[in-house]
Regions:
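Conserved ABC transporter NBD signature motif
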Residues: 21-32
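A short, proline-enriched helix->beta-strand linker immediately N-terminal to the Walker B motif
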Residues: 127-131
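C-terminal boundary and immediately downstream tail of ABC-type ATPase nucleotide-binding domains
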Residues: 201-227
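A short, surface-exposed alpha-helical micro-motif characterized by mixed small hydrophobic
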Residues: 175-177
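Conserved ABC ATPase signature
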Residues: 107-112, 116
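ABC ATPase "signature
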Residues: 193-194, 202
């Protein structure tokens, strides 16, 4: 918490408050995203780079149904009719193994669980086939059962769509299952980076040590309670 993970993710898509001064370079497919106009970066969002947020409720407009929001998203990024957009919306939910699709589409965001909203966001990303998915602590706001399912969805995404995923989490246990490489941040700076195996088994920075030992201590207490 407070290490700068989320603000870094938002900076990539120019979603930070205008009061923030963002400098440097963010190179994506040969282009510096910081130099793009608002119109150009808007076209990158969703189609080329999708973002799955920590609290899925903030990704949806509470005044519109899921159907309306999915259709508008696909119309924005794809040259298709409204009827085709509805068909694709149903396809996206089917890919997430969601049941009662017709009912889900007619629901408002507050009528669905956090885990279900996360699946809808991932389903939208699958249809748009972005080059990069930024997942900003997508398992934090949902229960442990849904966490496992969401992690599996991301693993399948990486495998089946050959998409790059920037997965943000404070839980090294989760990251050990999904990440090929790790970056450890503290107070807005990168303090350590390397392959997942290198970071977990041969860490060098004290902050990395703290994160790993904290996770191991929690797991030890959990096992004692379980017994």
């Amino acid at each position: 918490s407070g290490s700068g993970k989320s603000i870094t993710c938002k900076s990539i898509l120019n979603l930070v408050n205008k009061k923030f001064n963002v400098s440097g370079e963010i190179i994506f497919q040969g282009r510096d995203l910081l130099k793009l106009s608002q119109e150009e970066i808007r076209k990158v969002r969703g189609k080329d780079i999708s973002m799955v947020l920590q609290n899925p409720m903030t990704s949806f407009n509470p005044l519109y149904t899921i159907e309306n929001q999915m259709i508008e998203t696909f119309l924005e990024h794809m040259d298709i009719s409204r009827e085709k957009a509805l068909e694709i919306s149903k396809e996206a939910l089917e890919k997430m193994s969601l049941k009662n699709i017709e009912k889900i589409l007619k629901k408002y965001p507050h009528e669905l669980s956090g885990g279900m909203l996360q699946r809808i966001m991932i389903g939208i990303a699958i249809i748009l086939k972005p080059k990069l998915i930024i997942a900003d602590e997508p398992t934090t706001a949902i229960d442990s059962i849904n966490q496992k399912d969401i992690i599996e969805e991301f693993i399948l995404l990486k495998k089946n769509l050959n998409v790059s995923i920037l997965f943000v989490s404070h839980d090294l246990g989760i990251l050990s299952h999904i990440a090929d490489n790790l970056i450890v941040m503290k107070e807005g700076k990168i303090v350590e980076s390397g392959t997942t195996e290198e970071i977990i088994y041969n860490f060098k920075h004290e902050h990395t040590k703290f994160l790993i030992e904290t996770k191991r201590a929690l797991m030890g207490k959990f096992k004692k309670v379980k017994k």
